[in-house]
Curated annotation (Swiss-Prot):
Renumbered residue ranges of the record's region Large ATPase domain (RuvB-L): 1-185
Protein name according to UniProt: Holliday junction branch migration complex subunit RuvB
Organism from which the protein derives: Dehalococcoides mccartyi (strain ATCC BAA-2100 / JCM 16839 / KCTC 5957 / BAV1)
Any one GO biological process: DNA repair
E.C. numbers: 3.6.4.-
Residues annotated to bind ATP: L24, R25, G66, K69, T70, T71, E132, D133, Y134, R175, Y185, R222
GO molecular function: ATP binding; ATP hydrolysis activity; four-way junction DNA binding; four-way junction helicase activity
Primary site of residence: cytoplasm
Record-listed Mg(2+) binding positions: T70
């Protein structure tokens, strides 16, 4: 898969997005578009903590990439009026790395750990007393004479973000006071996000042009902002700078993004299941090998949206293309695939 395709439809943050995401990031809950139930519950928790003069309860945010987990963590810090320290699971390799971070926190500070599911179990164990008792247990000495020393930590808030909720251990999950799932955004919310971003970036666009971008954005704000930039470029070079419905449609067609936001790789995944494996069920690892892609990338980037559209089903024997997928790809639907199922299934994937 080319870097351009990855950059366009992936909900994951890439280098080109970082500066733009910061400039477009809302700074308070009322400006955060969508996720109403989450915002309401989070707003109550923040106000209650501020009124009591306490640190906010630990928060876990989970869902597909690009939906606003990092943005929400910054908003929480701004709403609480505290500092935020940002790190990620892969960056914390040893217990000492986490201990150094924890001991440098100030009262009520926020520690944001992205990809928290990638913490090792040894590192995770340091978090248990830190989250529950605001304490850090360290071992002093070695061998039979070693003893445990408990250091007090300031009251702080841990915000964990993950795309793999099921990979978190139960002891870690249980220590979060608030757990919120971010869902894909509906078209109206994405349209509002694209309109807001266009205004901030000074992009000229009519409502029909914005609609063309919104309906292809996979329900993901990060993808919407990325497509807006690419369509802006096309309008500047091929048109008069104004994003109209025709300009947006032409631009996105050139980028091989269809009317539902599916790109070449999405089509390849579905067509591989249909043409090579009789529509499925077929294991994830087999699909990955067939299209020369990593299984984790399919699972994190492509599969959630295909499931959301109802184009893909997860079964005990693997992934299966649905009737809707056949219709979208204009492929005749075959009802009788029993002979194929026995040939191409894998357990558990």
């Amino acid at each position: 898969m080319s870097q351009e395709k990855e950059r366009l439809i992936s909900g994951k943050l890439v280098t080109d997005d970082a500066k733009l995401d910061t400039s477009l990031r809302p700074r308070c809950l009322p400006d955060f578009i969508g996720q109403k139930r989450l915002k309401d519950n989070l707003g109550v928790a923040i106000q209650a903590a501020k009124q009591r003069g306490e640190a906010l309860d630990h928060v876990l945010l989970y869902g597909p990439p690009g939906l606003g987990k990092t943005t929400l963590s910054h908003i929480i810090a701004l709403e609480m009026g505290v500092n935020i320290r940002i790190t990620s699971g892969p960056a914390i390799e040893r217990q000492g790395d986490l201990a150094a971070i924890l001991t440098n926190l100030k009262p009520f500070d926020i520690l944001f750990i992205d990809e928290i599911h990638r913490l090792s179990r040894n590192v995770e164990e340091v978090l248990y007393p830190a989250m529950e008792d605001y304490a850090l247990d360290i071992m002093v000495g070695k061998g039979p004479g070693a003893r445990s020393l408990r250091l007090k930590l300031p009251h702080f808030t841990l915000i964990g973000a993950t795309t793999r909720y099921a990979m978190l251990s139960a002891p870690l999950r249980d220590r979060f006071g608030s757990i919120f799932r971010l869902d894909f955004y509906d078209e109206e919310a994405i349209h509002d996000i694209v309109r807001r971003s266009a205004r901030i970036l000074g992009v000229e666009a009519d409502e029909n042009g914005l609609h063309q971008i919104a309906c292809r954005s996979r329900g993901t704000p990060r993808v919407a902002n990325r497509l807006l930039r690419r369509v802006r470029d096309y309008a500047q070079v091929k048109g008069n700078g104004l994003i109209t419905a025709d300009i947006a449609a032409e631009s996105l067609a050139c980028l091989e993004v269809d009317k539902l936001g599916l790109d070449e790789i999405d089509h390849k995944v579905l067509k591989t299941i249909i043409h090579k494996f009789g529509g499925g069920p077929v294991g994830l690892e087999t699909i990955a090998a067939a299209i020369s892609e990593e299984a984790d990338t399919i699972m994190d980037v492509y599969e959630p949206y295909l499931l959301q559209l109802g184009f893909l089903e997860r079964t005990p024997r693997g992934r299966q293309a649905t009737r809707l997928a056949y219709q979208h790809l204009s492929i005749p639907y075959q009802n009788d695939k029993n002979n194929q199922q026995g040939l191409w299934t894998e357990n558990g994937s």
